[in-house]
UniProtKB/Swiss-Prot annotation:
Classification via InterPro entries: ATP-NAD_kinase_N, ATP-NAD_kinase_PpnK-typ_C, NAD/diacylglycerol_kinase_sf, NADK
Gene symbol of the encoding locus: nadK
Keyword field: ATP-binding, Cytoplasm, Kinase, NAD, NADP, Nucleotide-binding, Transferase
Similarity annotation: Belongs to the NAD kinase family.
Protein name in the entry: NAD kinase
Lineage, uppermost ranks: Bacteria, Pseudomonadati, Pseudomonadota, Betaproteobacteria, Nitrosomonadales
Amino acid sequence: MSSSFQTIALIGKHKNPGIVTPLSSLARYLQSRNLTVLLDNLTAASMDEDSYPAVAMEEIGSRADLAIVLGGDGTMLNIARKLAPFNVPLVGINQGRLGFLTDLSIVTMQQTLGAILEGRYITEQRMLLYAEVARSNVTTFGGLALNDVAVNRGIGGNMIEFEVRINDEYVCLLRSDGLIVATPTGSTAYALSAGGPILHPSLDLVALVPVSPHTLSNRPIVVGPDAAVEILMQRTAVARVHFDSHSHFDLEENDKVMVRRSPHRVTLLHPSDHSYYRMLREKLGWSGLPRNPT
């Protein structure tokens, strides 16, 4: 059966020797199906592989019909942000531990990928956030986030103080260790550990989750996808804004962090038997079996 995916990019966790054997095996498998295989530059360098074209991420974005990512959720987050502007579908393969984004097992990857290449898969669209930092009314930093944009105290031990506005309307003055602005994808990450709600990934919603607030009545709130969230730094010694915990920018008093929904989306492909609720049970350790199994 012919596949709608003809050019496949393989991307692995960088500087991880454990990716070499499975990625080489996967590349040979894809080539045996008469598909064109691309490696991103850093993956090719880690594999010491010259049998396949090694290209920059921008070229993967312009040429690939599908990107297969081998690693953990952190690797997937990084690649998803880079490829989001190109709308390249992503498949995530974990290295033994099930991830929220990397749900294919490395043990059965060829069989599962074979089904996906033949059109048996579930497509899922995930929203992204875009945030900018303004200092003296000049934008000094910006970036995408698939999980969350988080303002936190830095290496110092003091709480930070900031004002929160939504769509130019004042919400509150918050004294806490920080604030997490999370997507549904990020609702099962840092935001969950801070007491935030779990949002189904099919929803376009944003959760605002305080981190250790000084006033216990400061609770998480959920807002619509078109909400423009502004965080205005007040008295703060050391604070940072983090994008998916990968990149960060140091904040100063009177800096403004502006968070909005990005026009870009991430497309994930899952096996046809994928179940979000089963994944929640397995990842979060929910116990118990149904009393009346169907």
